[in-house]
Structure formats: C-alpha cells, structure tokens
Amino acid sequence: MKPSFSLPHFVNDQLDQFKISDKSFSSRLMLGTGKYKNLQDAINSINVSGANIVTVAIRRAQNTKNLGRTNLIDGLDWSKLWILPNTAGCESAEEAVRIASLGQEIVKKLGQFDNNFIKLEVIPDSRYLLPDPIGTLKAAEYLINKGFVVMPYIGADPVLAKQLENIGCATVMPLASPIGSGKGLRNLLNLKIIIENAKIPVIIDAGIGTPSEAGKVMELGASAVLVNTAIARAKNSQTMARAMSLAVESGRLTYIAGRMPISEKAEPSSPILGISK
C-alpha cells in the first residue's frame, strides 16, 4: 500500500481561504477571457485551470451581445464561477463609473445577485496601457460609496496602493509589467513593498508570461495572480492553464512553509559530529 500524504491542516482548511470582501475562494489563480483562439479554447482553459474567478470586459460583452453573436458569458457555467466584470477600455473616471453600473446589470442577469465586484481600470494611455492613478482613485472612491467591491488595477506604486486601501478598496491589483507584454516581473521591488504594507489582498495582474513568474510572486506573499495572455497565446492553452494553476499553488505553499535562511557559507547536509576519521 502506498503511503498517503495530506497537507497540514492549516494549509487546506478555512484558515487559508482566499477572501475578497466577504467571499471566499479556493483558487488563487484568476483568469481573463480575451485573446483566445476561439470560444471553446477559452472555456476549456478556464475549466482546466480550476480558477473560481473569471474577469470579463463589460464593453466587449455588451458589444458582442448587440451584434447578436455568441460570447464567452453564454458558454460558462456561472453557478460554479464568480464573474468579475471589468472596465477595460475606459479612459476616464466618469466613463469607468458608467461602465461599472452597466456591469452590474450583466451580473444580475447571470443570477449573481450578491455580486458587487468590479475590477476598476482607467487607462487613457493607448500605447503602453498604463493605468491613470488620479482617475483610478477618483472612480474608486465614488464606486465604494455606491456599494461596489472595488478591485483597482494600478501601476506598481506603493503609495497609491496604500491610498486605495485607506479609502476602502477590497484589493489592489498592481501590474508586474505592461498588459499583454509577457515581460514578467519588472517591478519586483515595488511589488514586495506593496505586499509588505498591505492589509488587503494584493493580486498581481498583467505582464506575467510564465508559471515560474506566477509562482515567484506567490512566494513573496501575493494573495493571488490574474493571468490572461500567457494562457490565451500559449501554443497549448489548456496545458499552460494547468501549469499556471500548479505554479500558483506551489508558490502559495512555499510562502506558508517559509523559505530556508540564505547563508554566505556552505553547510554540510549531513552532520559531521561523531563521524570517525
């Protein structure tokens, strides 16, 4: 009989649930829904990943519906997934607020009546797609007052992250590098500072290109990662989705386990005391 192995109770029980506001989730990998080869590829990748939270661009979903086309929203089982509507494409705070309200209508039609989540994106920069810190702060404050669970996408700015936490944001979502670039962890020091200072979940969003990069930020103490292009543009999206899932889980376990101290000198693996010469 093979020996069985189970994780310590503190890893797999309620103490390590990923919580946003008053909702708990079992997976710390969140997925985007754009850039897939086709609709079925997206659905299969999401299913393989084990992700609980899937983000959908409100504008794209609305435009697809208006054109009478089948979209990803119609193809997913929303009794098993939590939709995170986002304000992608909004260039101002005012526009983001308006689109967020439209997103609430879509969410309610899917039967998630207690879902007030919004991924806030205010991006006037069309070249590098860098978020507007002032517009984000302005829109976040308004949406929080309206009862939204606000999850702002931001640059890797520790001061802004703390300001957003202080006004009541449920999470902060700093970028690792520009959206869709696959450049990886270009702001690692700032991400470390944000994670260290935060009392709310820190979700690393944008720029992650490989599972090792996802695992690295989880090792540092990030609460979760959101991945889209790295999976959607992989040669085999389903395999990459599985790899990302394993990396996120591995990184989280590493963080909980605690890394060994780094030593300047070598230390023998086996004790030499008592060994005869």
From Swiss-Prot:
- MF (Gene Ontology): thiazole synthase activity
Q: Which GO terms describe its biological process?
A: thiamine diphosphate biosynthetic process
Task: Give an example GO cellular component term for this record.
Answer: chloroplast
UniProt-annotated location(s): Plastid, Chloroplast
EC no. given is: 2.8.1.10
Which residues of this UniProt protein bind 1-deoxy-D-xylulose 5-phosphate? G180, A206, G207, N228, T229
Q: Which SUPFAM superfamilies match?
A: ThiG-like
**Where mainly located?**
plastid
Q: Which UniProt keywords apply?
A: Chloroplast, Plastid, Schiff base, Thiamine biosynthesis, Transferase
Q: Which residues form the active site?
A: K119
Q: What's its top-level EC category?
A: transferase
- The answer on whether this UniProt entry bears the keyword Transferase reads yes
Q: In which pathway does it act?
A: Cofactor biosynthesis; thiamine diphosphate biosynthesis
Q: Which reaction does it catalyse?
A: [ThiS sulfur-carrier protein]-C-terminal-Gly-aminoethanethioate + 2-iminoacetate + 1-deoxy-D-xylulose 5-phosphate = [ThiS sulfur-carrier protein]-C-terminal Gly-Gly + 2-[(2R,5Z)-2-carboxy-4-methylthiazol-5(2H)-ylidene]ethyl phosphate + 2 H2O + H(+)
What the protein does?
Answer: Catalyzes the rearrangement of 1-deoxy-D-xylulose 5-phosphate (DXP) to produce the thiazole phosphate moiety of thiamine. Sulfur is provided by the thiocarboxylate moiety of the carrier protein ThiS. In vitro, sulfur can be provided by H(2)S.
Indicate the quaternary assembly.
Homotetramer. Forms heterodimers with either ThiH or ThiS.
Return the similarity comment: Belongs to the ThiG family.
Q: What is this protein called?
A: Thiazole synthase
- Name of the encoding gene: thiG
